[in-house]
Amino acid sequence: MSKAYWIVRVSVRDEQRYPEYLAAAGPAFQKFGARFIVRGGKFETMEGSARERNVVVEFQDRATAFACYRSPEYQSARTIRQKYADTDFIIIDGVAD
């Protein structure tokens, strides 16, 4: 069984309020064993367009990645995030070991 990942590109519209999303999302990340591989950091756009922040979150498997996204805990956080940021958000399978 391969791991699964959230790949999220973020443009924050309200830097002052965005931390509300981060705080609200924490319980879902803990509950589902999320592991941050990339969280912000310096980057260079080599092709195409970019957003100001990039996040990669690893989950045990595809079912867990979707369960976290669909959980009441994360959906509450998502509502907050949508007020303060624009995102491109995908869930993708990793390469099998």
Protein language model regions, located:
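C-terminal structural segments of small proteins and small subunits
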Residues: 65-90
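Short S/T/G/P-rich N-terminal loop/turn motif that feeds into the first structured element of a domain
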Residues: 1-53, 60-70, 93-97
